[in-house]
């Protein structure tokens, strides 16, 4: 399929996607019943969309195009009420988190969807293994060239986004010792990590044309990059965050990305170059492994900085942009999180350290989601 022209969208508008866990009480393992919930809510959602993701244990909640985080929060809140009622009617529960702490990937059923079945044919068992749960944020751009500039700018802050959203310390019944283990699942994919270097939209079109020769890439949706342009929507999509445990944190993360995008495209503070990516995977690893306690390294100077310090610096830089787009509350909440030194991964470990079981942890996550 040829790459569509870049659809011009209103700059800095938002679209947010949350991949939620569908679980079966009282054992709180993953359920294979997302199709039941989708059928139950399909005529009750007035804004946004509830739909399938790769496997039947995943339920995606997606907003419409939103002006700001307040509009997005309102849409999510309305969807949440409908989904929670449908889940209760079918003896299911819903929660966030980047991974289910003890599910077995071998049990996961790929959705009966042409695209997902084609992906299963291409990637085999890897598709069942990617039963992990992330938050994706789309930001509107006025042109393809703006999208490429924004993608490179946001890529500088991938470690910050990962550390602030880290919520996947447990996998397959084991403490992984990572704050965010979810991104590791994609490491076997040939398109894992950052997008190959291009400097403008024309070069991106040539890149996509080359990738399509492999026959594994039919559309942008088939690419698993950390951040990717979405020409159909006229957006840049950030894909590195774990699904938070609360709607409020999900909205705050979206506000962070929206404000960062506003700062980047308004101020144009960087002259991007390919060398920017030399230490990308090392810095990304630091955020996944250690969360806010990680250390990132500047590929140009060799300077090493605590991720906590650099995140506070970012929040300070984007504060004026956040004020202009109505996202100041998000930046203030994230500032408090950084100062506290906590992320959701640490809260999960604290629960288990205090004697909680992994079953109890999922139950707790369901209570948190329903109570937010």
Curated annotation (Swiss-Prot):
UniProt KW Acyltransferase keyword: no
SUPFAM superfamilies assigned to the protein according to its UniProt record, in alphabetical order: Glutamine synthetase/guanido kinase
Keywords, alphabetical: ATP-binding, Ligase, Nucleotide-binding
Enzyme class: ligase
The reaction(s) this protein catalyses: L-cysteine + L-glutamate + ATP = gamma-L-glutamyl-L-cysteine + ADP + phosphate + H(+)
GO terms, molecular function: ATP binding; glutamate-cysteine ligase activity
One BP annotation, GO: modified amino acid biosynthetic process
InterPro entries, per database record: GCL_type2/YbdK_subfam (IPR050141), GCS2 (IPR006336), Gln_synth/guanido_kin_cat_dom (IPR014746), YbdK (IPR011793)
EC numbers, comma separated: 6.3.2.2
Subunit record text: Homodimer.
Biological role: ATP-dependent carboxylate-amine ligase which exhibits weak glutamate--cysteine ligase activity.
Family: Belongs to the glutamate--cysteine ligase type 2 family. YbdK subfamily.
Protein name: Putative glutamate--cysteine ligase 2
Organism, scientific name: Shigella boydii serotype 4 (strain Sb227)
């Amino acid at each position: 399929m040829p790459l569509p022209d870049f659809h011009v969208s209103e700059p800095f508008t938002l679209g947010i996607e949350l991949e939620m866990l569908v679980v079966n009480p009282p054992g709180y393992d993953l359920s294979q019943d997302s199709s039941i919930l989708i059928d139950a809510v399909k005529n009750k959602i007035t804004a946004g969309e509830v739909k399938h993701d790769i496997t039947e244990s995943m339920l995606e909640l997606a907003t419409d195009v939103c002006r700001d985080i307040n509009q997005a929060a309102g849409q999510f809140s309305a969807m949440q009420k409908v989904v929670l009622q449908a889940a209760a009617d079918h003896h299911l529960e819903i929660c966030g988190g980047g991974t289910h702490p003890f599910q077995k990937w071998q049990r996961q059923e790929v959705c009966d969807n042409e695209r997902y079945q084609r992906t299963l044919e291409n990637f085999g068992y890897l598709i069942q293994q990617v039963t992990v749960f992330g938050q994706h944020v789309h930001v509107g751009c006025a042109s393809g060239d703006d999208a490429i500039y924004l993608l490179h700018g946001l890529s500088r802050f991938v470690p910050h986004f990962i550390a602030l959203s880290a919520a996947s310390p447990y996998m397959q019944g084991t403490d992984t010792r990572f704050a965010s283990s979810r991104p590791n699942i994609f490491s076997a994919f040939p398109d894992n990590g950052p997008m190959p270097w291009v400097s403008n939209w024309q070069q991106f079109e040539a890149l996509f044309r080359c990738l399509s020769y492999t026959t594994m890439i039919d559309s942008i949706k088939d690419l698993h990059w950390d951040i990717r342009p979405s020409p159909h929507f006229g957006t840049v999509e950030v894909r590195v965050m774990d699904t938070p445990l609360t709607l409020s944190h999900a909205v705050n993360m979206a506000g962070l990305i929206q404000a960062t995008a506003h700062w980047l495209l308004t101020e144009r503070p960087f002259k991007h170059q390919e060398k920017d990516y030399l230490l990308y995977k090392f810095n990304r690893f630091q955020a996944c492994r250690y969360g806010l306690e990680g250390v990132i390294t500047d590929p140009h100077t060799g300077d090493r900085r605590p991720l906590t310090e650099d995140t506070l610096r970012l929040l300070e830089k984007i504060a004026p942009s956040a004020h202009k787009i109505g996202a100041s509350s998000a930046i203030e909440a994230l500032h408090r999180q950084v100062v506290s030194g906590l992320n959701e991964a640490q809260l999960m470990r604290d629960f288990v350290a205090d004697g909680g079981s992994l079953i109890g942890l999922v139950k707790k996550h369901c209570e948190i989601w329903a109570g937010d």
